[in-house]
Amino acid sequence: MFVNAAITSTAQREFRSTAAAQRLSLDFLHEYVLGNYRDLYAATLALDVNQLNAAMVVTNLLRTAREASREQRAREGRLIAARLRTLPPQRVYGVFRDLRRLGINNRRTRAIVRDWVAARPDPAFDAVKYRRSLSVAARHAHLPLPGEVGTALFAWRRPRRYETPILEAWRRAHYDQRALYELPYTVAEGLAAQHGIDRARFLSGIAPRLTAGERLRLQGSAVRHKVDGVAMDLATAPLTRLASYALSLPRPERLRRRDELTGALRAAARRAARRQAGTWGRVVAVLDDSYSAAGSGTKRRRPLAVALATHYLLEALAADFTGLWLHHRGDPLLVHPVGATGLGMRILDALERGPDRLVIVSDGWDNDPPGQAAEVLRIWRTRLDPDQHTSIVHLNPVYDADTFDVRRLADGVATVGVRDAEDAAALVELARFATGRAGFDELRRHLADRVERFLDDQEAVS
C-alpha cells in the first residue's frame, strides 16, 4: 500500500480528487507507516519511489530521530545520504528548507547537509541558480563556504568584480543584458523581465543553455513566439516524458510527424528495456484511454502518457506483443482520452489470445458496466486458469486518496502503482507482494536485499 502511494502520488490534483485530499491522505499514510513500521519506512528510500515521497521520508526520519535506536539511526543516515545523491538539487534544497522550518538542527542533520553541499560539483553555480536555498542551508547548518561563494550569497554588492566566471556574469547581468545569456535559464528569466527583454529574443538567446527538462516545458512557449532554437532532443528524452510531449501535440501534427515520433518512442523503449528486450514472451496489454486518462489541469494527460509509454516499452520487452486500447483503434500515437472505462470486454479480448503475460494499465475505475473486469478476472483465475499459466499485473498510475492506495481491479490480481513506464519491469518484481501470496517476512527479506544493493551501488560511485 505505502509503496504504491509513494510511487504514484505527488500530492497534486487528480481527475477524481483534489490536491488537498491527496496531501491529507499522503501525510496520514506517511505518519502511520513511520510510527508502526519504521524500518520498512526507511527502506523505501532504496525503492523507486517518486521525488516528493523520497523527500518526505528523509524529512520525517530526521524529524523523529529521537524515536530510533542507535543502529536504526546509523542505517537511516546511510540511506538518507545515498538517496539525497540521487535527487535533483532543487528537491534536496527543499528538504533543507523544511528542516529549517521545523527547527531540526541536530549534529546529525548538520552533517548530512554539510556532506551533501560539500559534494556539489560547482558551489558557485549553486550560489547563482539556487541562491536563496543555499543561503538557507548555509545559515541553518553553519556551513563554511568556499572562495567567493559566501560573499556572493551574503554581501554580493561589495565586490567590484568576481574572479569566478559565473559569479561575475551574474553580477554584470544586473546592468548588462548580454551577460544574462551566460546564466542558467531560471536565473536569466527573472533578469530578462527586469530588463524588459522581448520573450522571443530571450528564448533565442538562452536556448543553448537550456536543460532537457526546460526544453520540454518551453515547447509551447517556443511555438507561440516562433522560436526554432528550443527544439527538444527526441533522441535522448526519457520514454514517459517523450510520450507526454507527443500527446501535447495536436493530432494533425502527430500525424505529420508520425515516423519521427514513433521512431523516438521505440528507441526510448529499447533503452529502457535494456537486456530484457524480447525476453517476456507473448504479451498482451489492455490500455486505458477513457476520459479519466486526461488527468487533471495539474497533471494533464499523465495517465494516458503512462499508458502510451507502457505500450512501447512492452513492445520492446515482448517477443510477441498486442496492445488493446479501450476505445482507440489504429496507430497508438493518435490516441486521445474519451468515453467510459469499460475494462471487462477488453480483458476478455486479451485473454482469448492466450498470452504469457497480461498487463493492464488503468486507474482502476471500471464503470462500463461497473465490476465487470473484477468478475472476468475472478472467473479466469478460479476456473479457467487456476494454475496461473498467464501472469496478470495491473499497473495503476493514479493514487486513490480515499483508500490510501491505488485502486485495485480484483482480489488475487497484483496491482502496483506506476509513475514512469520505464519502471514497469522492476515493478512487476514487486507485484507478488501486492496479492498477499508473499508473506511479511519475505517482504522484509526482499527490502533488505534492495537496501544493500542500493547502498552498495551509491557508495561505490560517491
Short names for language-model regions:
Residues 280-281, 293-321:
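…and closely analogous acidic/polar surface helices at protein-protein or active-site interfaces
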Residues 1-285, 292-296, 324-462:
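Long lumenal/extracellular ectodomains of secretory and single-pass membrane proteins
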